[in-house]
């Protein structure tokens, strides 16, 4: 490793000291634990989801999945260079969209179901109108959003005309899709953006990063409002609590965590029975009681958020699970994997 000069090392030490003081101050304000407050609550049933359908069509690793607002359709992106829009009720393909670059890492469905977006190692975000087709019969490309200096890791629609993206250049961008212009840059992370989750009211969002932190942002302001520490490795995924008052995170450090935004700190930590897997993605049930986390070993772990205990495991994938997405109505969980499969859990 290159030698660090004394002045730079002094700055590093000063920053780390401030971070530790910040964390210690937060811990001192935690007057109780989740287990103490929720210990007398009734246990919830073991998770009983099973893999009812396997969506087959991709011929390479599937990296991302996201549901439309109707809870029926989902879109998946794979290294085979295709987006596939699925009807999850019938397990049929609705559309297949060939991509210019096969290195797709993230996909998003607009809440209305009218548009899908994707991006990855091509350092751009591409938006398609699923209701309009070009001369070849493929969904019409409406926007190519350029200007990234790193891979695109996450994207989410605020509505049909606005999109938020996170990328490997440590930036979050707000786009006006009607004009095709970037309206705002959000800067604050010190590492690649890895995950992004919108609040239920669409006014704020959470990001997770390789810098081991999660941050809260207001869509109208360029600087973050809160920063959350705790993880010891990359924060791969974040998911807003249905109440809008907290969020869950999943990390390479083999833990998931629950944060309370109002208390400005972590309130629970979740670990698998055997610490043999980092977590790649997370989702909260519509009640907020179940936390689901996908692992690099190919299983989906379920946790009781209130009792802070492992609640079960969903098995079926044969390789690393890359992404999970819960339908807005909470009735179906979709998962994607390096085993080229998309599974629906009901």
UniProtKB/Swiss-Prot annotation:
Statement: the UniProt record of this protein carries the keyword Flavoprotein: no
InterPro entries hit by this protein: G-protein_beta_WD-40_rep, Gprotein_B, Guanine_nucleotide-bd_bsu, WD40/YVTN_repeat-like_dom_sf, WD40_repeat_dom_sf, WD40_rpt
WD repeats: 57-96, 99-138, 147-185, 188-227, 230-269, 274-313, 316-346
Source domain of life: Eukaryota
One GO BP annotation of this record: signal transduction
UniProt KW keywords: Repeat, Sensory transduction, Transducer, Vision, WD repeat
Keyword Metal-binding: no
Function (record text): Guanine nucleotide-binding proteins (G proteins) are involved as modulators or transducers in various transmembrane signaling systems. The beta and gamma chains are required for the GTPase activity, for replacement of GDP by GTP, and for G protein-effector interaction.
Family named by the database record: Belongs to the WD repeat G protein beta family.
Subunit field text: G proteins are composed of 3 units, alpha, beta and gamma. Interacts with Ggammae/Guanine nucleotide-binding protein subunit gamma-e.
Protein name: Guanine nucleotide-binding protein subunit beta-2
Organism: Calliphora vicina (Blue blowfly)
């Amino acid at each position: 490793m290159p030698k660090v000069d004394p002045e730079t090392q002094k700055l590093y030490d000063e920053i780390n000291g401030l971070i530790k003081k910040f964390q210690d101050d937060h811990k001192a304000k935690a007057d109780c634990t989740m287990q103490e407050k929720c210990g007398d609550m009734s246990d919830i049933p073991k998770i009983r989801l099973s893999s009812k359908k396997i969506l087959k069509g991709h011929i390479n690793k599937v990296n991302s999945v996201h549901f439309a607002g109707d809870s029926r359709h989902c879109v998946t992106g794979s290294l085979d260079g295709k987006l596939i829009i699925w009807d999850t009720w019938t397990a049929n393909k609705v559309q297949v969209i060939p991509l210019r670059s096969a290195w797709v890492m993230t996909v998003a469905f607009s809440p209305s179901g009218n548009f899908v977006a994707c991006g990855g190692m091509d350092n751009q975000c591409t938006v398609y109108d699923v209701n309009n087709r070009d001369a070849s019969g493929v969904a019409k490309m409406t926007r190519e959003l350029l200007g990234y200096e790193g891979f695109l890791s996450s994207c989410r629609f605020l509505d049909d005309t606005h999109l938020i993206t996170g990328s490997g250049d440590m930036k979050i961008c707000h786009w006006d899709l009607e004009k095709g212009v970037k309206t705002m840059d959000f800067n604050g992370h010190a590492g690649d953006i890895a995950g992004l989750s919108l609040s239920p009211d669409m006014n704020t969002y959470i990001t997770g990063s390789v810098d081991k932190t999660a941050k809260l942002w207001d869509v109208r302001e360029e600087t973050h409002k809160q920063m959350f520490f705790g993880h010891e490795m990359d924060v791969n995924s974040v998911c807003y609590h249905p109440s809008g008052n907290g969020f869950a995170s999943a990390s390479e450090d083999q833990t998931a965590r629950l944060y309370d935004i109002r208390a400005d700190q972590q309130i629970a930590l979740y670990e698998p029975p055997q610490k043999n897997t980092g977590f790649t993605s997370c989702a909260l049930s519509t009640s907020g009681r179940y936390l689901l986390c996908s692992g690099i070993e190919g299983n989906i772990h379920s946790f009781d958020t209130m009792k802070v205990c492992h609640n079960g495991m969903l098995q079926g994938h044969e390789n690393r699970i890359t992404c999970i997405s819960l339908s807005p109505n909470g009735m179906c969980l979709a998962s994607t994997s390096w085993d080229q499969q998309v599974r629906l859990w009901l």
